Amino acid sequence: METLRADVWVIGSGAAGFMAAITARLAGADVAVVGKSGPGKGTSTTFAVGAFAGPWDGQTEAAYKERVLTAGRGLNEGGMVDIAAAEAPDRFQDLIDWGLT
């Protein structure tokens, strides 16, 4: 039986899994990614078919937050929405730069 070793194991090969894996690797960890299918296949990211909720076309941070809160029907964690609104443009650009879109 083959034994695989890594500092960090990431379960899931969608955008979130790859973001975690790349971030860990950039921090110097030896990383392994495990998914139920090939890279980027069979994931929620794939099923979204590019319909990510991001601040596109110059949408303001406030407008993006309102859109997320509306979609979440008021059940969102406010602090997390604030972080997402502030970070989303740069994180989406990271995914594009890494070829994950």
Sequence positions of predicted segments:
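Short glycine/serine/threonine-rich phosphate/pyrophosphate-binding segments
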Residues: 16-20, 42
